[in-house]
Amino acid sequence: MTSSRDALSIAQALLRCPSVTPADAGALGVLETLLKDAGFTAHRVTFSEPGAADIDNLYARIGDGAPHLCFAGHTDVVPPGDADAWSHGAFSGDVEGGLLYGRGAVDMKGGIACAVAAVLDHLAAHGGRPKGSISFLITGDEEDVAVNGTVKLLQWAADRGETFDHCIVGEPSNVEAIGDTIKIGRRGSQSGMLIVDGLQGHVAYPHRASNPIPDIAALITALNDEPLDQGSAQFQPSNLEFTSVDVGNPATNVIPAQARAKFNIRFNDHHTQDSLKALIEQRLAAACGNRIRARIEWLPSNADVFVTKPGNFTDLVTASIADVTGRTPDLNTGGGTSDARFIAKYCPVVEFGLVGQTMHQIDERTPVADLDQLTAIYRGVLERYFKS
């Protein structure tokens, strides 16, 4: 059986586990069995948090020396949506026309399957042991609140004395074809609620009331008028987006007492969460003057900005991609947040996996040929990494 076929069979086994967060549905067990059979020491660790579901996680390692390369990812998936809209069952793992179908095919059970297949191939070619250490850090809590997953598993590993030299997260990083993009960082994310207080009253007597709606509209305009920055060497400009405006007023003859607007900021490495909040508060105060009564309620966030500077590790991954695909990948920091933000606090990390065009969609799918290529790229990474 070829390694690409191994990746396919592993992916199918994972896809047939309906592991919608927080359910595991046997997905971690599939990986644990494969890795234990290959000589890994595996640990299943369950974390709890008040108000959140308990989540099972997997950490497996082979080898006890440096360098230590970690593959990280998640086996949980988003809900499939309308089951009847799928041309193949969302958890069928069916292959038709060279395409593998299933929720998680690209995000990111397919990527995990390729990493496992590549590692098994590498070990088979090198006497069953790496010239260093290889680990898998896999959570079932990435697609939801992400409080009982990677962030706690990393701390658990650190408390045991585990250290990582580099990490690859198998998120679907590519835009159109395998090898076109490596994610070397992510913007931070901070959400908040802008609240403007007015004075409720009858619309026929506006002089006896204070309407917060024109005021919140003016503040939204003011906060959007001036850019937060011009971007940096690795990041696009930071961006503030208002996502809703609400007054909770069902009446047409009552001026509301309060208006609220939700917003999110995706910010680059010019800012920290604290400095960003201070900047927005300063601009809000200037826009309010002495007339408008407004404040911001900031929502909790664990999504800090991070970047892995291009260097030997990104060069190694780039060379492995070029060998298999002939492409030179773009190193970028676009897109949303991922668990790589937690890993970046422990070691340099990049994200490289399948093509993300169908992730979270009905009929999520990946070409089987892409599984072949990604497995070959990961094999190349392993060969270079443990020779360097």
UniProtKB/Swiss-Prot annotation:
The cofactor note from the UniProt entry for this protein is: Binds 2 Zn(2+) or Co(2+) ions per subunit.
Q: SUPFAM superfamilies annotated for this entry?
A: Bacterial exopeptidase dimerisation domain, Zn-dependent exopeptidases
Which Pfam families did the record assign?
A: M20_dimer, Peptidase_M20
Entry's InterPro entries?
Answer: Bact_exopeptidase_dim_dom, DapE_proteobac, Peptidase_M20, Peptidase_M20_dimer, Peptidase_M20A
Disulfide-bond pairs as recorded: none
What reaction does this catalyse? Answer: N-succinyl-(2S,6S)-2,6-diaminopimelate + H2O = (2S,6S)-2,6-diaminopimelate + succinate
GO biological process terms held by the UniProt record: diaminopimelate biosynthetic process; L-arginine biosynthetic process; lysine biosynthetic process via diaminopimelate
Q: What is its EC number?
A: 3.5.1.18
Q: Name one GO molecular function term.
A: cobalt ion binding
Return the similarity comment.
Belongs to the peptidase M20A family. DapE subfamily.
The name this protein goes by in its record = Succinyl-diaminopimelate desuccinylase
Q: Report which gene this protein is encoded by.
A: dapE
